[in-house]
């Protein structure tokens, strides 16, 4: 019996030792995977500037976002910022302020801690425009939360489709006889045919009659004017 008890105690001790060793290994793995430990964590540094405005007037309401809200930083009273515990990778750094707009910057961090800053180009993603590091982020103006209401102008009235449909035919009727040689009967006949082709509604007046009256009235006025001039010349003689 004492030998059996001694063997059982030795077995329990060895089992407990194995369990302790296993727990130590698991805790070591958790320490390596934990976000706050390890030497592969870096910091993103920079400065935000608003031209003509003191940093004390706006830094209290601003935040620095790295990769969305994955890492959040705050600005000091001089406009500088440091975001700690950022692993290696490629991140978009933004300064968010309700009163000022800042362009985002992409920061690439290598596994050895080398930093590279460049413009964020959503159209040409392969184009790389280097920026200095630590970051120097300058405000581009106030954010545009609202769209300016459009004002009414004369161009809006003139470019209205209904107005153009009313004005253009009138201009054609008035200016076309002055440009085209109306004394030519063939030209007049072609114009009447083309206008009749456009007039598809039978309830509307005949365009050819209108054109004939217009041209004949002009030609008769010209002939009467020339006749009167000839009579006046004859009387003078």
Curated annotation (Swiss-Prot):
Compartments, as annotated in UniProt: Endoplasmic reticulum membrane
Protein name: Endoplasmic reticulum membrane protein complex subunit 7
Transmembrane spans: 157-177
Topology class, membrane: Single-pass type I membrane protein
Biased composition (Low complexity): 217-237
Regions of this protein lying in the Lumenal compartment: 29-156
Keyword vocabulary terms for this entry: Endoplasmic reticulum, Membrane, Signal, Transmembrane, Transmembrane helix
Gene source species: Xenopus tropicalis
Domain of life according to the entry: Eukaryota
Quaternary structure, from the entry: Component of the ER membrane protein complex (EMC).
Signal peptide span: 1-28
InterPro entries reported in the protein's UniProt record: EMC7, EMC7_beta_sandwich
Biological process terms in GO annotation: protein insertion into ER membrane by stop-transfer membrane-anchor sequence; tail-anchored membrane protein insertion into ER membrane
Family under the similarity heading: Belongs to the EMC7 family.
Known role: Part of the endoplasmic reticulum membrane protein complex (EMC) that enables the energy-independent insertion into endoplasmic reticulum membranes of newly synthesized membrane proteins. Preferentially accommodates proteins with transmembrane domains that are weakly hydrophobic or contain destabilizing features such as charged and aromatic residues. Involved in the cotranslational insertion of multi-pass membrane proteins in which stop-transfer membrane-anchor sequences become ER membrane spanning helices.
Cytoplasmic side, ranges: 178-237
CC terms in the record's Gene Ontology section: EMC complex; endoplasmic reticulum membrane; membrane
Pfam families in the record: EMC7_beta-sandw
Disordered: region residues: 216-237
């Amino acid at each position: 019996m004492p030998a059996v008890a001694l063997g059982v105690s030795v077995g329990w001790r060895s089992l407990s030792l194995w369990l302790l060793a296993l727990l130590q290994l698991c805790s070591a793995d958790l320490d390596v995977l934990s976000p706050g430990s390890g030497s592969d964590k870096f910091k993103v540094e920079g400065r935000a500037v608003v031209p003509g405005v003191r940093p004390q007037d706006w830094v209290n309401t601003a935040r620095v976002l790295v990769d969305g809200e994955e890492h959040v930083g705050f600005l000091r009273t001089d406009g500088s910022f440091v975001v700690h515990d950022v692993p290696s990778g490629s991140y978009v750094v933004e300064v968010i302020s309700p009163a000022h707009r800042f362009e985002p910057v992409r920061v690439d961090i290598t596994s050895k801690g080398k930093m590279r800053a460049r413009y964020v180009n959503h159209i040409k993603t392969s184009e790389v425009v280097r920026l200095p590091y630590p970051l120097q982020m300058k405000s581009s103006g106030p954010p545009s939360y609202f769209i300016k209401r459009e004002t009414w102008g004369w161009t809006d009235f003139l470019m209205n489709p209904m107005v153009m449909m009313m004005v253009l035919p009138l201009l054609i009727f008035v200016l076309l006889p002055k440009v085209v040689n109306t004394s030519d009967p063939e030209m007049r006949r072609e114009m009447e045919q083309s206008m009749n082709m456009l007039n598809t509604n039978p309830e509307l007046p005949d365009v050819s009659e209108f054109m004939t009256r217009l041209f004949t009235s002009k030609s008769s006025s010209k002939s009467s004017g020339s006749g009167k001039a000839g009579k006046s010349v004859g009387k003078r003689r």
